[in-house]
């Protein structure tokens, strides 16, 4: 019997969720995802010093003011790590725009365009890049514009069906529903109810989104994310993509138990599901009705924003050191 990892690869595209190119290289995954939180963990490691210092030097050469220089450097760090990751996989990498722009449609559009153009100018193939945009109403409006311009988007921080429907209406290439964070909220709110894996709130949320998309032939891909256990991953076998931490990927490689397909297009099409008529007011009302989605979306933005600020502080110190050496 082959490993669960190998069995799962026959049912879903496996994606490695890390900022560490070396871990991506050994993961055996097709694609990779990263974010400021993950890059922050590895950006200052000695083995990646060159990626960091090159980004800082490039940013300084753009001759912007202090704020512009910091923006240039942060995006170049992402691009450098993204390109290094792409050397290790055959597929795509997802890079994220600044979470502090989450409620400014035009700013997100401009930042995504800049990131995409910088990626291409540094030698990247735009077809292998997904730009991560938060699943706010404003973010989804940005996605609608960007997709028309040929910039493939990964709508992240998806916590319920209405966000998924809105992203699909905007023709997003891909969405990332967060299984583990949904589960975390339910456990924090109601305690450990001893959920069976099939009743896991995070698993159920992704299953509902999958059913809706497949029922109505929606081409937007679903990449389930933020897993807390191997069991959650296996419970979504058959989902378009699964982005999994290196730790859980290793657990899957060590286990040879059989893997069953849990999500199936034909089965989804047989279910009685009604289409949702989407407007901004419907989106905002249904988000307001969903305490979990509202709270976890806000929390996710705060976490990514906070990690970006920590990364900024570290980069600022590096810039000061370089300036002092040149003085």
From Swiss-Prot:
GO molecular-function term, one example from the UniProt record: transaldolase activity
Active site: 132 (schiff-base intermediate with substrate)
EC numbers, comma separated: 2.2.1.2
Alphabetical list of InterPro entries matching this protein: Aldolase_TIM, TAL/FSA, Transaldolase_1, Transaldolase_AS
GO CC annotations on file: cytoplasm
Subunit structure: Homodimer.
NCBIfam families: talAB (TIGR00874)
Name of the protein described by the UniProt record: Transaldolase
Organism classification: Bacteria, Pseudomonadati, Chlamydiota, Chlamydiia, Chlamydiales
């Amino acid at each position: 019997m082959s490993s669960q990892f190998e069995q799962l690869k026959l049912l879903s595209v496996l994606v490695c969720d890390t900022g560490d190119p070396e871990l991506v290289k050994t993961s055996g995954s097709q694609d990779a995802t990263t974010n400021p939180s993950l890059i922050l963990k590895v950006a200052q490691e000695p083995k990646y010093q060159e990626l960091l210092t090159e980004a800082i030097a490039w940013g300084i050469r753009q001759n912007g003011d202090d704020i512009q220089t910091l923006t240039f450097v942060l995006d170049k760090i992402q691009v450098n790590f993204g390109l290094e990751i792409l050397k290790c996989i055959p597929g795509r990498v997802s890079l994220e725009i600044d979470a502090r722009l989450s409620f400014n449609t035009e700013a997100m559009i401009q930042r995504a365009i800049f990131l995409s153009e910088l990626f291409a100018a540094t030698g990247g193939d735009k077809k292998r890049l997904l730009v991560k945009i938060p699943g706010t109403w404003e973010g989804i409006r940005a996605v609608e514009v960007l997709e028309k311009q040929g910039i493939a988007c990964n709508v992240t921080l998806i916590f319920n069906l209405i966000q998924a429907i809105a992203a699909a209406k905007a023709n997003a290439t891909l969405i990332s529903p967060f299984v583990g964070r949904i589960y975390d909220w339910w456990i924090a709110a109601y305690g450990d109810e001893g959920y069976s894996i099939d009743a896991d709130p995070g698993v159920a949320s992704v299953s509902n989104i999958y059913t809706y998309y497949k029922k109505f032939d929606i081409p937007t891909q679903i990449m389930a994310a933020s897993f807390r256990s191997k069991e959650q991953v296996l419970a979504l076998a058959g989902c378009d993509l699964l982005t999994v931490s290196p730790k859980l990927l290793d657990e899957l490689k060590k286990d040879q138990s059989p893997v069953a397909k849990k999500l199936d297009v034909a089965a989804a099409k047989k279910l009685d599901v009604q289409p949702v008529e989407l407007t901004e007011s419907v989106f905002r009302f249904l988000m307001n009705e969903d305490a979990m989605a509202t709270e976890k979306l806000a929390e996710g933005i705060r976490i990514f924003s906070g990690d970006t600020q920590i990364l900024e502080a570290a980069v600022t110190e590096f810039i000061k050191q370089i300036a002092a050496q040149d003085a």
